[in-house]
C-alpha cells in the first residue's frame, strides 16, 4: 500500500479544507515556528487511530477541533481523510476489493470519533489493524515527532523493543494474540461455569432422589390421616352436644343472680346522693379559709423581704462609707508623692539646664575640619585610581594590539582563499531553462482547475447532504417532540376525564358537573357547598337540589357575593346567594356579623359559618379537587386543539426533509465519481512539473548560494583588510607608551596619609555630637517628668474634693437607714399573729370537709361494689348466653361438617367409626392429639415435590448432555492454547529474523554515518525475544564500545537515526515522517543525514516527509511545501521554491 494524499478540514489550525499530497521520494515541509507544521504529522497519526489526547498535544480529544481565532468562530467538527493506493491488494480481506482506500476519521464536539473506510463505518480497531498489517500506524517508529529521537535515546530497553516489533510486522500478531487470549479466557471461564453447573445438577439430582422417597412417605401418611379425620369429627360432635346441655343450665342460674344484684345497687345510689348534698357548704368554708391564709402568707413574705432589704441597704451604705474613707486616704498619699517628686526633679532640672547653656558650640568647627579632610582623601584616592587605570590600560593595549595584528593577518589570508574558490565554483555553474517546463505548468494548471471544480462540486454536494441531514434531524426531533407533547396531553386528558366522570350510583349527574366558577374561585365554591355538590338536579334522584326562594342578604363591608362569580343552575341560586367571599385576614372579624344561614369563604378555601363553625383551607375537600380537575381538563383540551394541527404540519415537514435528504445523497454519490479521474490527470501533470522545478530549483539554488557566498566573502575581505591596517597602527602606538610606576607609588602614599587625617576628624565630630545630644535628651526627659507629676497632683486634689462630697451624702443615707429594720420587724410580728388565726380556721374547715368526703367515699365504694356485683352478674349472664349461642352454633357446625365431609348423619358416623379397624383414643382430645401427631409427622417432612421422580429423570438427561458439551469445550480450549503458542512461535521467529536484518543494517549505516567505528544491537533482560529489551552498543571511530547512554548528544542523535533507518531497510513502512530530526546536528552531520535519506529513497519504496528549518536539508528535497499563518491562528499549505523556503524559515 502507498499513501497518496492527506486531507484536513477543521483539524487544529487547518480550519479550511487542505490537501497535502504524499509523493514518492523526499518531500520537505518548511515554515516559521508555531505555524502548524507538526499538525500535519499529528493529523496523520490521528487518522490512523491515535486515541491519546496527550500524544496530540491536547487536554482532551475535542481539543483537536479548531477552537476559533480572533476573526473566525470555533468549529464543531473536524475530519481527516487519508487516501491509500491498494493496487497491490495487500489490505485486509474485507477491504482488499478496492484499488483505492479512503480512510476518514471525523470527530464531533462532545460526541466522539467515527471511522469510515470507503464510506463504510468501521471500528477503530479495524483501522488500527489495517495500518498495523502495513507495518505502520499511529505509534509507528517511522513517524518521528519532535523529541522522539531524544525519547528513543533515553527509552528503556523494553520500550525500544517496539521498533523491532513494527519492523517484524508482529504488531498485528500482538493484537490477534490478545484477541485469542481473550477468547481463551472466555472459553476457560465458560468451562469453569459449565463444571459448576454440572456439579449443581449432580447435587440437584441427588436432592430429587431424596425428595422422591419423601413423597412416598407423604402419600402413606396422608391416607392414614384421612382415616382418623372421621373419628375426630364424631368425637367433636359428642363433646359439642354435652357442652350445650351444661351451658343451658348455667344460663338459667345466672339470670336469677342478675335480679338480686340490681336491687342492691339501687339502694347504694340513694346513700351517695345524700352524702353529696351535705358537701357544698363545707367546700365553700374551706375555700374562704384557704384564700385568707394565702393572702396573709403573701403579706408575710413581702414583710420579710422588706426587712431583709432594709438590713442589706444599711450594710451596703456602711461599706460605701468605708470605701470612701479608704479612697480619700489613697488620694492624699498620691498628692504627697507628687509633691515629693516635683521637689526632687527641680534641682536636677536646673543643673542640666546650666550644663546645656554653658557647653560651647564646637559642632560647626569640627564639621568643617572633617569635610576638608574628607575632600583631601577623595582627591588623593582619585589620583591613585587615574594613575593605576593608565598603567593597566597601557599594558592591556600592548597585549591586545599584538593579538589583533596576528588575528587580522590570519583572517585576511582565509578570506582571500575562500573568495578565490567560490568565484571558481560560480564560473562553473550556468543558468539553464527547459522550454517544455511552461507547457507542463499549463497542463498542471488545467488539471488543477478541473480537480478544483470536481472537488468544489463534491464539497457542495457534501454540504448540501449535511445540511439536508441536519434539517431532517431537526424536523424529526421537532416532530417527535410535538408528538410526545400531544401524547402526554391526550393521556392527561383521558385520566382527567375518568376522574371527573359522574360517580353517582343512581345514574343521575351531580350538580358539580353543571357548575363553573370563575378562575381562582374553585376552592371558594368547594368550601361553600362541600359534599352537597354531589347531589343531583333531577328530582327523581335520592338526593337532589330542588331550588328555593330566599331573600338577598345584606353583607358587611369587605364581603363580595359569590353568586356572580359562579355559573350555576337556578336550583343552586338560593344557596349561593347566602355565600360571600372575603380575605383570610377579615374572615374571623366578619363572622360575628353573619345572620342565620349566611357563610363566608376565602379564595384559598377557608369557611366561616353563621353558627360559629370554621374550616381552614388545609381541610380536605374532594369537591375542590374535582373542580380543579375539571378546570385542568378544559385547559388540556384547549392545548390539544392547538397541538393537533401543529403535529400534522411537523409530520408533513419531516417527510419533505427526508425526500430532500435522499436527493442530496443521490447527488453526492454522483459527484464522488468525478475527483478520482481529475486527480489522476493532475498527478501526471504534477510529476512532470515537479521534475522540471526540481532541476531548475537545484540550479537556481546552487547559483544563488554561490552568489551569496561570493558577496559575503568580498565584504569579509574588505573588513579583513581594514582590520589589518588598524591592528598594525595600534601595535605601533602601544610600543611607544612610557613608565608611570614611580608616580603611582607616590600617589598611593599621599592617599594613605589623607585617609588617616579624615578618620581622626570624623571621630572628633562624632564624640561632640553624641555628648550634646545626650544632654539635650536628659533635659527633655526631666521636663516631661515634671509636667507629669504636676498633672498627677492636680488630679489627686480634684478626686479628694469629690470624695469629700460623696462621704457627706453616704453618712446622711446611713443615718436614715438605721430606723427602717425595727419598724418592719414590728409589722412582721403583727402579720404572724393574723396568719396563726387564719391557719386554725383553715384546719377546722378542712377537717369538716374531710369527714364529709370520707362519708361520701364510703357510700361510693359501697355503690361501686354493688354495681360491680351487678355488672359481674350481667357479664356472667351475657357470657353464658353467648356461650349458649356458641354451643348451639358449635353443635350445628360440627353436625353440618359431618354431613358435608362424611356425607352422613352424626349418629351414622358414630356407627361407622365404631366399625373402623383404626386404633384411636375414645375422647376427642385424644383423637385430635393422634391426628395432630400424624399431621406433625407429615409436616415434618417439609415441602414435598410430588414430581420429584419425573424431574430426576429430566436432570439425569441434562447432566449427560452437559458432560458432552464440557468435553467439546475442553477441546476448544486446547486448540486455542495451541493457536496462541503458534502465534508466539511465529512472533519469535519473525522478531529474531527482523533483529538479525536490522542489526546488520544498523552496523552498516552506523559506519557510513560516522565514517568507521562499530555498533551492534543486543536483546537483554529476558531469554524470550517477545519479552526481551533492546540495548544499543556503539563505538565511534577512536572510542571504546559502550552503551548509547554514554555517548555525546550528537553521537546519540546519529546513532538513533541509524537505528530508525535500519528498521526501514528491514521492513520499510509506506511512509516516514521526520519532524525536525536534523535540528541538533551540525552542518557536517546534516549532510551525512541527507545522504542517508537519499540512500533510503533509493533502496526502499518509502515516501519520506521531512519537517525542517535547515537550508541544507531543504536543498536536498525533491519538493517543498510551506506552512504559513498569514491569518493569526489559521494555517495554510503552499508549494514553495528554495528561495521562498529560506524566507519562510527566516520569518
From Swiss-Prot:
Coiled coil (residue ranges): 173-221, 288-327, 365-496, 646-698, 743-880
Keyword Acyltransferase: no
Gene Ontology MF terms in the entry: ATP binding; ATP hydrolysis activity; DNA binding
InterPro entries xref list: P-loop_NTPase (IPR027417), RecF/RecN/SMC_N (IPR003395), SMC (IPR024704), SMC_hinge_sf (IPR036277), SMC_prok (IPR011890)
Subcellular location: Cytoplasm
Family: Belongs to the SMC family.
Protein's recorded name: Chromosome partition protein Smc
Source organism of this protein record: Caulobacter vibrioides (strain NA1000 / CB15N) (Caulobacter crescentus)
